Design a protein with these regions (language model features):
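Amphipathic alpha-helical coiled-coil scaffold segments and their short linker/junction regions
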Residues: 76-81, 224, 228-232, 263-335, ...
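A short glycine-centered flexible hinge/capping loop motif at secondary-structure junctions
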Residues: 219-223, 434-438, 475
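Membrane-embedded beta-strand positions in outer-membrane beta-barrel channels/transporters
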Residues: 77, 142-144, 188, 291, ...
């Protein structure tokens, strides 16, 4: 075969391969972007693997904890504020709004743009009875300056609105920290309650096993019946069942705390135990004082106030549309030209050119668009102001409920302490009487169940005081303030 034909065949093969590759790639993209073919089973497409790989790339390494250290609540809160992704989201949003304010403020300054142009044109020109080759070169530096001299407040309205929106984003950032702190406190106290319930459940199991052992000994001496022993075994099995339930709740509490800290649930975290904490008996605060603080410092309420300021600034911007705006434009140009024509010497010239203009813009008629935009902006202001009143009522009610819950928890703590002491004495007396044959086994198991419930109630009451105290600080907005402003128990 002729070499040219071989080259032609090879070229056609390459073209066919390229066409097949393009068509297959296009088909794969079409399949990847196609909707599920039917509603009766899940979709699995070609793009699923790539998305799954991208999803794995967003995984961050978990926090590392010292296994020998018991972390206190302030240390856990510091870790949560540093590593919980919610604070990062709120922070980036605040930075975005701050940048938007900077963009709005840039309207106070002129806009200056520079451009450099260079070109060469070569061709033939006809002069007299012949053509001559001609070369013309051009080099220009152009500055374009634009500035709004006045617009009757439209620019100022946009700047004020952007500033208020940046302020609202900062308050939202603070509110995110308030929520993260409260979630960490809740998870910590939930874990303390679960750990305390585990201790109580193990003590209950130990008591039930002691009762079972006493029943077995009495049965071996003919002083008890088989039903008594079966009742004791049933109580021990019930105590074991309750212990396993408590262990499961403790695992969940560990996961909740890890989630609040911004790490994976299986992270091992040792925390300061409940017995090392001081449980307050009273609180040196009044509900009126807590309400006043909440209405003055709650970041979500302050965010609402900033929203009102932004809405009012938008009204100012909307009103400015009824008035003219004056713009100034200048475009100085430095130009350099040179030329060469056949049989003639080079020619060159340079100079300053350009222009300037004032432009007055005034919308005379727009089909009531300005009127409706102004009405819309004013309605947004009224809505935002009404939302503040709604938020104030909600905050006052939240503080009232949190304060009431705290007082209730303090009273229940006193009752739980007395209940535990009485139940412990009752159980000891019942078991001793049973060993002497003065009480039956039903009395002992009943006392044992009462003691178990009293232990559980005591743990719950102690952690409930701490939880409700944290809730009051959360509702009043004290958790993100300086320590000097927080209520002291």
């Amino acid at each position: 075969m002729h070499p040219s034909r071989l080259r032609s065949s090879a070229a056609r093969a390459v073209v066919r391969a390229a066409i097949v590759l393009i068509l297959s790639h296009g088909a794969s993209l079409a399949l990847a972007q196609r909707a599920p073919v039917s509603p009766d089973h899940p979709w699995h497409g070609l793009g699923e693997a790539r998305i799954e790989a991208d999803a794995r790339n967003f995984t961050e390494p978990g926090l590392s904890f010292d296994r020998e250290k018991a972390y206190s609540l302030p240390e856990l809160i510091d870790l949560a504020e540093s590593h919980n992704p919610e604070t990062r989201v709120a922070w980036e949003h605040a930075r975005t709004q701050a940048a938007a304010w900077g963009v709005a403020r840039s309207e106070l300054y002129p806009t200056v743009a520079a451009a450099a142009l260079a070109g060469v044109d070569r061709g033939q020109v006809y002069l007299a009875d012949r053509f001559f080759r001609q070369t013309i070169g051009d080099f220009e530096v152009v500055l374009n300056l634009n500035y709004t001299i006045f617009d009757f407040g439209a620019r100022a309205g946009r700047i004020s609105a952007a500033k208020a929106e940046a302020l609202a984003a900062n308050f939202a950032f603070n509110d995110t920290h308030r929520s993260v702190i409260y979630r960490t406190e809740q998870a910590y106290y939930q874990l303390l309650n679960a750990s305390g319930q585990e201790e109580a459940a193990r003590a209950n199991l130990s008591n039930a096993q002691a009762v079972q052992q006493a029943a077995e000994e009495r049965l071996s001496h003919g002083l008890a019946t088989l039903p008594d022993l079966l009742e004791a075994r049933s109580a021990a099995a019930q105590a074991e069942y309750e212990l396993q339930a408590v262990l499961g709740a403790e695992e969940i509490a560990h996961g909740n705390l890890a989630n609040a800290l911004g790490t994976i649930p299986q992270t091992a975290i040792r925390v300061q135990p409940l017995r090392e904490l001081t449980i307050p008996g009273t609180i040196d605060d009044t509900v009126n004082s807590a309400m006043d603080r909440a209405l003055a410092q709650r970041p979500d309420l302050l965010q609402r106030v900033a929203d009102v300021q932004a809405a009012k600034a938008r009204v100012k911007e909307a009103r400015a549309a009824y008035y003219p705006s004056l713009n100034f434009t200048a475009s100085p140009t430095v130009q350099s030209l040179y030329g060469l024509q056949q049989q003639f010497p080079w020619g060159q010239t340079a100079g300053l050119a350009g222009g300037m203009a004032f432009k007055l813009n005034w919308t005379v008629f727009d089909g009531k668009a300005r009127k409706n935009r102004l009405a819309q902006a004013e309605a947004i202001v009224h809505e935002a102001e009404a939302q503040i009143r709604v938020s104030r009522d909600q905050i006052a009610n939240e503080v009232w409920a949190a304060y009431s819950d705290l007082n209730t928890a303090l009273r229940q703590r006193e009752a739980a302490t007395a209940l535990l002491e009485a139940a412990g004495r009752s159980y000891d007396a019942a078991l001793e009487s049973y060993n002497y044959g003065l009480r039956n086994l039903l009395d002992v198991t009943a006392a044992q169940r009462t003691l178990a419930q009293a232990r559980s109630t005591d743990v719950l009451a102690r952690t409930q005081v701490l939880t409700t105290l944290a809730a009051l600080a959360f509702r009043a907005g004290d958790s993100i303030q300086s320590n000097a402003m927080k209520p002291r128990p």
